[in-house]
């Protein structure tokens, strides 16, 4: 499998971080920036609390679906989803292992954490 050029890691959900909503604002800014592009050749990896952005309760489900429709691969950590009891709540993206997400981050030409 070809390694992605850009991998964006999203480990937080912006709710319980005690940073006055800064994580939520950072994620919202990322979503809006990605939506400025017609094609999005990136992989977004969600793990730990960040998997909550991909559930039916997320305020960004429709935006994330649009980002996926524009070419982004959206990956949720299966173990994180299971630990949070969220496996049946996945609204957008696909499940993969933590090891595979690590491989994507390590193998990417560019990686960032939001």
Model-derived features with residue positions:
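N-terminal beta-loop-helix "entrance" segment that forms/cooperates
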Residues: 43-45, 50-60
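Short, well-ordered alpha-helix to beta-strand connector turns
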Residues: 41, 71, 108-109
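A glycine-rich helix N-cap at a beta->alpha junction
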Residues: 59-86
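C-terminal structural segments of small proteins and small subunits
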Residues: 84-114
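Conserved mixed alpha/beta catalytic, RNA-binding, or beta-rich assembly cores of soluble enzyme
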Residues: 4, 9-48
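Solvent-exposed alpha-helices and their adjacent loops that cap or buttress functional pockets
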Residues: 1-2, 37-38, 67, 103-106
């Amino acid at each position: 499998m070809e390694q992605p050029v850009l991998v964006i890691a999203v480990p937080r959900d912006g709710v319980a971080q005690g940073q006055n909503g800064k994580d939520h604002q950072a994620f919202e800014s990322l979503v809006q920036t990605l939506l400025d592009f017609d094609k999005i050749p990136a992989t977004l990896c969600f793990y730990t609390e960040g998997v909550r952005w991909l559930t039916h309760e997320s305020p960004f489900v429709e935006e994330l679906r649009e980002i996926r429709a524009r070419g982004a691969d959206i990956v949720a950590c299966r173990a994180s989803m299971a630990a949070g009891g969220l496996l049946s709540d996945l609204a957008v993206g696909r499940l993969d292992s933590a090891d595979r997400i690590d491989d994507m981050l390590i193998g990417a030409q560019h990686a960032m954490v939001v």
